């Protein structure tokens, strides 16, 4: 018997050639250095388990009192986080979600009908393709280009706006490039959105991890907000707690548009009511304790970045996030697969993030320092590299 599945889920779900090569190498017992690990809970960081887990036992969570936006105490904790970033956020302008992925889903439903378009920077998350497919939204990439740093190609961005375009997505700072959106870039983005009647969606999950000259990155939550703007973040990166499943959307913009957006977002959130009570009650504690894990992560990432920069391998400029793009010597084949086979090092192919140049690969800066140093030593010593 055969069944019909939706066209929106018509992905190629077979194992990729690279994933198969990694699996087969591990099954064969090869000692691989994995430079793709991005889960902080398995990277040797010290979590205050008692402090982080004790609020989950709050008996008050046994009472069900749903609010589509999320518990007020949890939203107030998020608002205080933005106060730390010099931004004034009304708790009533926040909607809690189980993840930033869910937040994207809410916003695509809010802003788009089937077949509408959203502009997304490239390179960027591969996850966007799946999120858009599930909401019957079409993604149109606009390029970031590299010239002693990453920059937005505004001319190309505006050329790609069409009659069905509804929003521009900005990942600030961008993953994997680490490009942080500057004040002048923000002004140009807002001007383009105003000119074309578009919403601005800003993903700030890596905001607390600057690696460049600036000690702090400015949030898009800082006003003014001349256009309808949605700022997304969550505890996966802010507190290194991806397993706790907490994200949110903060809504800004002209009063009438903002009020309409919030009213509709509340209905969308009320339809799913996906947030659970224990996590919401624990959120203020997790937010208060975030500094300890952030310091550990930032120190690790900075040290690993320094190792990469001194390894002899070319590291493309990175201003933030937990990874780096390496530019290796050009070869005929797939660079990531060659490094796996010849050097026993696992890296992400640049194509995973939409990077067209075959010699570029992406490495996580989050892993244990000894493994990272050995991985870069192997890459630098691979034939063709200057190291």
Language model segments and positions:
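Conserved glycine-rich beta-strand-loop-beta hairpin in the small C-terminal domain of fold type I
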Residues: 280, 284, 298-309, 314-328, ...
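Conserved core of the PLP fold type I
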Residues: 61-191, 208-223, 230, 314, ...
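PLP-dependent enzyme catalytic core of the Aspartate aminotransferase-like
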Residues: 80, 88, 158-159, 338-347, ...
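Conserved core segment of the aminotransferase class I/II
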Residues: 222-302, 382-384
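N-terminal small-domain helix-loop-helix segment of the aminotransferase-like
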Residues: 2, 8-99, 106, 156, ...
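Helix C-cap/helix->beta junction micro-motif
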Residues: 28, 135, 195-196, 343
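Generic structural signal for small/hydrophobic residues in well-ordered secondary structure
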Residues: 35, 78, 94, 118, ...
